Amino acid sequence: IDYRKCQASQILKEHGMDKVIPLPELVCTMFHISGLSPQAEV
């Protein structure tokens, strides 16, 4: 599990740069914000 990628995506989204984040990154961010483990998707 790479939480750093999730956190990086969240930071980018907060700065309005979420449009440049690939879909998998955005999904990872949404899981992170929701408090769910990214593993749940697998």
Curated annotation (Swiss-Prot):
Summary of the tissues where the protein is detected: Mammary gland specific. Secreted in milk.
Cellular localization per UniProt: Secreted
Primary residence: secreted
Key words, A-Z: Calcium, Lactose biosynthesis, Milk protein, Secreted
Sequence ranges assigned to domain C-type lysozyme in this UniProt record: 1-42
Example of a GO cellular component annotation carried by this entry: extracellular region
Annotated transmembrane regions: none
InterPro entries reported in the protein's UniProt record: Glyco_hydro_22 (IPR001916), Lysozyme-like_dom_sf (IPR023346)
BP GO annotations: lactose biosynthetic process
Job description of the protein: Regulatory subunit of lactose synthase, changes the substrate specificity of galactosyltransferase in the mammary gland making glucose a good acceptor substrate for this enzyme. This enables LS to synthesize lactose, the major carbohydrate component of milk. In other tissues, galactosyltransferase transfers galactose onto the N-acetylglucosamine of the oligosaccharide chains in glycoproteins.
Record family assignment: Belongs to the glycosyl hydrolase 22 family.
Subunit structure: Lactose synthase (LS) is a heterodimer of a catalytic component, beta1,4-galactosyltransferase (beta4Gal-T1) and a regulatory component, alpha-lactalbumin (LA).
Protein name in UniProt: Alpha-lactalbumin I
Lineage, opening ranks: Eukaryota, Metazoa, Chordata, Craniata, Vertebrata
